[in-house]
Amino acid sequence: MNRVLSKGPKGLNGLLRACPSNSGRSFLYHSTYNVSSRTFWSASRLRSEDSPSGSQPLKPDPNDGIGNNTSSASSQHTPWYLQEEALIEEPRQISSRDQIPELPENSPAILPVLLDYIFKDLGLDELRLIDLRGLETPPPIGANSIMIIGTARSVKHLNVSADRLCRWLRSTYKLTPYADGLLGRNELKIKLRRKARRARVASRAGTTVDEKDDGITTGWICVNAGVVENSPVGEQASRKVEGFGNIVGGTRVVVQMFTEEKRAEVDLEGLWLATIERDRRQKQVSIDTKSDAPHEEVRAPTPVQNSSSDHVFGPHCRSSTILPLEQRRGLHSKCRLLGPETEHNQEDGLDDGLDDGLDMSPDSISTPTDQLAANRTCDKEVDTDSLLEHLSGLPDGQVLSELGAGQEDRDSTPFLRRFYDALSQMSTEEAAVALVKLLCTAISRHHQGYSKESLWKAFMTCNYHTYPISDELGFEIVSALLTALPPHQKGPKATGVLPEADRELALRVLEHLSLRGTDVLNMKVFHLLYEAASHPTSFSGEEVIKDVTDATKDRPTSRVAKMIESLDIQFDPEDARKLMMSMFRNGDYDGFWNLWHKLPLYGSPRTSADYEMLFRLHADLRDECRARDCVSTWVPMMSREHPPIPLRGQVVQDIMHCLLIGEPAIDRMARAGSTSNLVLIWNDCKNIALGRGRRGSVERMNVV
């Protein structure tokens, strides 16, 4: 076998050639010494033995694509994660969620910073800026406002964004924003916990909790930043003013935050855009109407004063054009003033007395310039003010008779004739303000011919035309509207009843005053509100409450007192003393003593008039226990005041009256030789009243 199968490749090759193939195909073989990297061929061809394997390079079959694919794949194949995509040259579309709205003209300096903070730091989407300056905006927003509307991503994002915005405005710009609908950080967590607890309890009981308005998912928070810029907005060509109150110089910024569902439901921007479009159309119509109308001759608002060198002497010819609401004034040598003593005369005597009020005869005036200057001192506004001042000093009965039958009566009394005569010669602005003052006086004196509705209409007329109303006059209007019905009235409208409609009118006046910039959070306003709360709203609520200690907490006045304590109101000594008297008469003794102790702490030392009021109130109360405590405690304190209060005058009579209430038999006890503190005070007061001037007992009590 070894001889047949010779060793080496040649022997094996010969054996394979000698063996016939059963399938008609030859076996392919590879040399064990000459290994090729080529794979097996699929074609049925024999390899020539004569051709050496390594002499010439192998040429692949043209029909075989494996060689080409292998060589090209090694050079062109790249994994997918290393392949670079071709850059898209089309510009990226920026949605409205990623845009900051454009700034309007004459915008405040804080507006771009505020928009950037809301967009980048707070993360509100779909910002929309609406310029409401010049429009009639509702009172909660205020006049001259710029509104920003944004969308939060959730209820929690809404509350957190509003809270951060308020804190940022306070710390960065020292503003005082307020957010309607905002829940505090802890408050939101507590409410969410309670809601989850109720849901768990309901699920255990097999029921569902249906809370449509749980106070959490309102989805709307309004952050009013207030006035962010005090400089006035550029005046437009038109002088027309919309809304109520004076022209507000500053610009307000209001940020409206919504959730996506609530914003789509409310559609606030749609409402305001429709309002702006309607206002634009109205202005366009008015401009077209004015352009088509013929030009009219008008008088300049301020007369031009020529110098003395330009003055032309001689007759001055006036235009024959009749101007509407034209003032006609004449030069008089006498100023008509109404003295208090002339009102008691007869009707004829009153006319003479008014003409003889102040003599400015031509003898005392040398030149026409002096006559003109003297005439300017007798302005008609001062004339009406003097008439009203004289009227306010008269008793109630005489005031009612002087005011005539009612508002339509203008000539039944000398006062009405003089007043409306002066009113006809005044400008429309001055006449409207003077009429408001007359209505306030008439309503405060309980004249049935002058209604509170007419006062409200007169006030709104002044607001609509932006007539100047002082803060003092505004508070007089509120006081007149809060005046209770007269004591002598019978029937359903009983004594001291203040209807709810009158209270609502007074609160609306305070709201308009607040929009004009008037400080309504003061002692005077809260005293008026306290007085109004002490009156019942109907006949059924007029019953007197005897048990003060049990019913004080349920009274409406207690809520006003709590507001006074909680708010940081500037202390006004005069109004505080009035509020003290109202509290004592209403049974709020704790509030009375609280203000009584605050007087010296706020730099207003107690005076003799204060002690007279103290002892008189306790005497009128006719409570024996309170009267005794008041006398025994505060009579010795009079000498410790700074400066000390002397025991003399009217305060002595008030102390003795209070002692008689607290101890009816005190005079008999004094004659019996009692040495109690009240008897010692009684003896001192009695000696001072008799002119003996002894105060030894009170001084000994102070030492003790």
From Swiss-Prot:
Keyword Lipid metabolism: no
GO biological process, one term: mitochondrial gene expression
Topology within the bilayer: Peripheral membrane protein
Keyword tags: Membrane, Mitochondrion, Mitochondrion inner membrane, Transit peptide
InterPro entries in UniProt: Atp25, NT_sf
Major place of residence: mitochondrion
Family recorded in the similarity comment: Belongs to the ATP25 family.
Protein known as: ATPase synthesis protein 25, mitochondrial
Organism: Aspergillus fumigatus (strain CBS 144.89 / FGSC A1163 / CEA10) (Neosartorya fumigata)
